Amino acid sequence: MREETVVYEQEESVSHGGGKHRILAELARVEQEVAFLEKELKEVENTDIVSTVCEELLSVIEKGPDPLLPLTNGPLNLGWDRWFEGPNGGEGCRCLIL
């Protein structure tokens, strides 16, 4: 009796769900997502300790100047400092990420 109920429920879900093709497409999508998540999990398991990776990334970033900020090779215009609250000398501003 239980087997007949399961078959009936499956037939009913197919008729309401839009057909076999839609169910197979959804199944393929779910299998693709599972494969993607398994790949991500393997990458996370093989990754070093996150704090070590972050420290290495931070040291690489701090070595070079910010590419979005122009470098001033001429004399400093101290008039700009009042608008941007920069330092009064030529030592520049260094922002650190904690």
Swiss-Prot record:
GO terms for cellular component: cytoplasm; Golgi apparatus; Golgi membrane; heterotrimeric G-protein complex; plasma membrane. Keywords: Cell membrane, Coiled coil, Cytoplasm, Golgi apparatus, Lipoprotein, Membrane, Methylation, Palmitate, Plant defense, Prenylation, Transducer. Residues 96-98 form a propeptide. GO terms for biological process: acropetal auxin transport; defense response to fungus; G protein-coupled receptor signaling pathway; lateral root development; protein palmitoylation; protein prenylation; seed germination. Its main location: membrane. GO terms for molecular function: GTP binding. A lipid is attached at C93 (S-palmitoyl cysteine). Induction: Induced locally by Alternaria brassicicola but systemically by Fusarium oxysporum. Disruption phenotype: Enhanced susceptibility to Alternaria brassicicola, Plectosphaerella cucumerina and Fusarium oxysporum associated with a disturbed expression of genes involved in cell wall metabolism (e.g. lower xylose content in cell walls). Reduced induction of the plant defensin gene PDF1.2, and decreased sensitivity to methyl jasmonate (MeJA). Hypersensitive to auxin-mediated induction of lateral roots, within the central cylinder, attenuating acropetally transported auxin signaling. Enhanced sensitivity to glucose and mannitol during seed germination. Abnormal roots architecture. Residues 19-98 form the G protein gamma domain. Residues 88-94 are annotated as: Regulates lipidation and cell membrane subcellular localization. Residues 20-50 form a coiled coil. It is found in: Cell membrane; Golgi apparatus membrane; Golgi apparatus, trans-Golgi network membrane; Cytoplasm. It comes from the Eukaryota. Guanine nucleotide-binding proteins (G proteins) are involved as a modulator or transducer in various transmembrane signaling systems. The beta and gamma chains are required for the GTPase activity, for replacement of GDP by GTP, and for G protein-effector interaction. Involved in the abscisic acid (ABA) and ethylene signaling pathways. Regulates acropetal transport of auxin (IAA) in roots and hypocotyls, and thus modulates root architecture (e.g. lateral root formation). G proteins are composed of 3 units, alpha, beta and gamma. Interacts with the beta subunit GB1. The dimer GB1-GG1 interacts with NDL1, NDL2 and NDL3. Binds to NUDT7. This is Guanine nucleotide-binding protein subunit gamma 1. It comes from Arabidopsis thaliana (Mouse-ear cress).
